[in-house]
């Protein structure tokens, strides 16, 4: 049986450059879905991933659902 509070949770990562830019030429915000272990990484996750809207590798931060 699963515990009431799962250790491994699904999180969303969002590009910080796209979220802060208000340019009209941007078509959206890059988001990735991944999993993290709450016991090993209790703080918010930051990963460097490719953003298809910025066309470069940028920092993606964990966002609330």
Swiss-Prot record:
<dbReference type="GO" id="GO:0005840">
    <property type="term" value="C:ribosome"/>
</dbReference>
<keyword id="KW-0934">Plastid</keyword>
<keyword id="KW-0689">Ribosomal protein</keyword>
<dbReference type="InterPro" id="IPR011332">
    <property type="entry name" value="Ribosomal_zn-bd"/>
</dbReference>
<dbReference type="GO" id="GO:1990904">
    <property type="term" value="C:ribonucleoprotein complex"/>
</dbReference>
<keyword id="KW-0687">Ribonucleoprotein</keyword>
<dbReference type="GO" id="GO:0006412">
    <property type="term" value="P:translation"/>
</dbReference>
<dbReference type="InterPro" id="IPR001705">
    <property type="entry name" value="Ribosomal_bL33"/>
</dbReference>
<dbReference type="InterPro" id="IPR038584">
    <property type="entry name" value="Ribosomal_bL33_sf"/>
</dbReference>
<dbReference type="Pfam" id="PF00471">
    <property type="entry name" value="Ribosomal_L33"/>
</dbReference>
<dbReference type="GO" id="GO:0003735">
    <property type="term" value="F:structural constituent of ribosome"/>
</dbReference>
<dbReference type="InterPro" id="IPR018264">
    <property type="entry name" value="Ribosomal_bL33_CS"/>
</dbReference>
<comment type="similarity">
    <text>Belongs to the bacterial ribosomal protein bL33 family.</text>
</comment>
<dbReference type="GO" id="GO:0009507">
    <property type="term" value="C:chloroplast"/>
</dbReference>
<keyword id="KW-0150">Chloroplast</keyword>
<protein>
    <recommendedName>
        <fullName>Large ribosomal subunit protein bL33c</fullName>
    </recommendedName>
</protein>
């Amino acid at each position: 049986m699963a515990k009431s509070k799962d250790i491994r949770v699904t999180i969303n990562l969002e590009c910080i450059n796209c979220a802060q830019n208000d340019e009209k030429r941007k078509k959206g915000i890059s988001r990735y879905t991944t999993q993290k272990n709450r016991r090993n990484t209790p703080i918010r996750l930051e990963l460097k991933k490719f953003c298809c809207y910025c066309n470069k590798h940028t920092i993606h931060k964990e966002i609330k659902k």
